[in-house]
């Protein structure tokens, strides 16, 4: 995949997210920046699966030095390597052994999947959905040597937009 040729939207209501890991997968993939190939990073050490589609927003730079991460919540699993237009509803703030690591929380635009069209902000998601996401990230590195995660909590769409804007500016230098 050549991200340079991808028409990237940074509109909070129609954001391009490259899916690296499909919902329910237990394999962590990462896009190789040089080749554009989707590389297997590792199989999760614990008996867990990703609770949502997981990827990144192209042409951004998060506080961890990589493109900013994004979870795309949907009842379906999107193919790894696909690009989904999504709308921001919040952000998960966490810290791991490498430092701060924000995860944007998004839903597919209604044209792609109208199932959750009523969700406009993080507080519109069920407590159970947020608890599953939080639990996954609190525990998915538990069995890996020298790795840890501390989930700081969820913030609203306004905070997510600030994280996105900061990541765009960091990418642009």
Swiss-Prot record:
Question: Binding positions for substrate?
Answer: 28, 42, 54, 140
Magnesium in keyword set? yes
Which cofactors are named for this entry? Answer: Mg(2+)
Q: Where does Mg(2+) 1 bind?
A: 64, 69, 101
Compartment(s) of residence: Cytoplasm
Q: Which domain of life is it from?
A: Bacteria
Q: What is its EC number?
A: 3.6.1.1
Q: Which InterPro entries match?
A: Pyrophosphatase, Pyrophosphatase_sf
* Chemical reaction(s) catalysed: diphosphate + H2O = 2 phosphate + H(+)
Q: Recite the UniProt keywords alphabetically.
A: Cytoplasm, Hydrolase, Magnesium, Metal-binding
Q: Does the keyword Magnesium apply?
A: yes
What residues bind Mg(2+) 2, as annotated? 69
Pfam families per UniProt: Pyrophosphatase
Which PROSITE patterns would you find in this protein's record? Answer: PPASE
Q: Name one GO cellular component term.
A: cytosol
Q: Molecular function (GO) terms listed?
A: inorganic diphosphate phosphatase activity; magnesium ion binding
Biological process, per Gene Ontology: phosphate-containing compound metabolic process
Its family remark reads:
Belongs to the PPase family.
Q: Assembly and interactions?
A: Homohexamer.
**Main function:** Catalyzes the hydrolysis of inorganic pyrophosphate (PPi) forming two phosphate ions.
> Which named protein is this?
Inorganic pyrophosphatase
What is the primary gene name for this protein? ppa
């Amino acid at each position: 995949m050549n991200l340079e040729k991808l028409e990237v939207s940074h509109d909070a209501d129609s954001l391009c997210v490259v899916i690296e890991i499909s919902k329910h997968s237990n394999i962590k993939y990462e896009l190789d920046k040089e080749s554009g190939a989707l590389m297997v990073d590792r199989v999760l050490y614990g008996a867990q699966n990703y609770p949502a589609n997981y990827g990144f927003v192209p042409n951004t730079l998060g506080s961890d030095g990589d493109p900013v991460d994004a979870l795309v919540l949907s009842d379906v699993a999107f193919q790894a390597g696909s690009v989904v237009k999504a709308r921001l509803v919040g952000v998960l703030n966490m810290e791991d052994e490498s430092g701060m690591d924000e995860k944007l929380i998004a839903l597919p635009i209604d044209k792609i999947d109208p199932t959750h069209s009523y969700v406009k902000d993080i507080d519109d998601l069920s407590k159970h959905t947020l608890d599953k996401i939080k639990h996954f990230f609190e525990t998915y590195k538990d069995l890996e040597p020298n790795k840890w995660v501390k989930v700081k909590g969820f913030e609203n769409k306004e905070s997510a937009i600030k994280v996105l804007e900061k990541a765009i500016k960091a990418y642009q230098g």
